[in-house]
């Protein structure tokens, strides 16, 4: 029975995707050690495993509890690329005879390229058939959107959050989130945010510049994963009253992501489906989808 350690940086939700990939193939039981504390998980199965003691906290990715890791007989450490900032941790684990695998799913620009990483973990656990089935569910959802009559809506979508200094954090063009919007039949704005160079797929811009480039967006999807979910337009406007002039705000086309958006890599087909529904629905009463709410 392989004991796996996942050392993950606490502050970085983007790097917790491996846990969701293990969840999708019913493999969370094979993870004994976590680099994220219980309150850092939105994935229920991970929370439950930590609560019951099946999974235990083994220190942050850059300061793991080596003694605990050795005592637990860990057979493989799965790290995010954050480990490259602390090569001494990787060296030490390998000195102790623990192989280290660096998880690079976050470098995939096609959303389902990220989801497909579940097949790799399935090979480790002998669950290839489970992974094939779960992956096909997501590709089927994407195919359905891509072959629908309204696959190209021409609607523009801004996806952003406002940080504590009042700057607007947007995705770069070619990043997997802007690609999800394009695959869903939308057009991501602002258009000229530069290509994602993988190392950093987001950038900050001043509100005035964002206003000039995105105020006519047909839809706003507010990224709530960093500073918590919004439930009203007033909460959005409290972040910047300039948003009141945005077309999407005036038209009532403002949606907000759920907090678990970036921890759930295995459902990116469902997320694309959600965005497509937002762009094509005529149902004004629709205000709740799998990963978004109005």
Q: What kind of feature is each model-predicted range?
A:
Residues 92, 99-108, 160, 173, ...:
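Catalytic cores of extracellular degradative/oxidative enzymes
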Residues 11, 16, 20-23, 130-184:
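Basic- and aromatic-lined ligand-binding clefts that recognize polyanionic substrates
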Residues 108-126, 130-137, 219-294:
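Structured C-terminal subdomain patch of bacterial secreted/periplasmic proteins
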Residues 140, 144, 176, 204-209, ...:
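Alpha-helical scaffolding within the catalytic cores
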Residues 8, 21, 54-60, 77-80, ...:
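Second-shell loop/turn segments in exported
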Residues 1-14:
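Short, small-residue-biased leader/transition segments that mark boundaries at the very start
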Residues 177-200, 221-224:
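His/Asp/Glu-enriched short active-site or ligand-binding loop at hydrolase and phosphoryl-transfer sites
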Residues 17-124, 208-227:
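Acidic/His-rich segments in extracytoplasmic proteins that coordinate ligands and/or metal ions
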């Amino acid at each position: 029975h392989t004991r796996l350690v996942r050392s993950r940086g606490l502050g970085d939700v983007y790097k917790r995707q491996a846990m969701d990939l293990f969840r999708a193939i019913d493999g969370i039981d094979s993870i004994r050690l976590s680099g994220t504390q219980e309150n850092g998980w939105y994935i229920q199965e991970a929370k439950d495993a930590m609560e019951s003691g099946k999974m235990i906290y083994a220190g942050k990715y850059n300061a793991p509890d080596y003694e605990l890791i050795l005592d637990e007989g860990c057979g493989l450490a799965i790290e995010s690329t954050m480990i490259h900032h602390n090569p001494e941790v990787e060296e030490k684990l390998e000195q102790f005879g623990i192989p280290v695998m660096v998880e690079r799913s976050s470098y995939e620009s096609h959303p389902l390229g990220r989801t497909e990483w579940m097949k790799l973990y399935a090979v480790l656990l002998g669950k290839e058939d489970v992974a094939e089935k779960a992956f096909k569910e997501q590709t089927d959802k994407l195919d359905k959107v891509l072959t629908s009559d309204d696959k190209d809506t021409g609607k523009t979508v801004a996806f952003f959050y406002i940080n504590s200094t009042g700057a607007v954090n947007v995705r770069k063009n070619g990043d997997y989130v802007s690609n999800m919007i394009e695959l869903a039949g939308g057009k991501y704005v602002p258009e000229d945010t530069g290509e994602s160079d993988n190392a950093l797929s987001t950038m900050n811009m001043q509100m005035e510049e964002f206003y000039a480039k995105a105020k006519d967006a047909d839809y706003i999807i507010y990224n709530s994963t960093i500073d918590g979910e919004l439930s009203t337009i007033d909460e959005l406007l409290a972040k910047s009253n300039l948003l009141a002039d945005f077309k999407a705000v005036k038209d009532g086309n403002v949606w907000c992501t759920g907090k678990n958006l970036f921890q759930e890599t295995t459902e990116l087909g469902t997320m694309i489906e959600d965005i497509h529904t937002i762009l094509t629905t005529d149902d004004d009463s629709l205000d709740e989808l799998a990963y978004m709410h109005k």
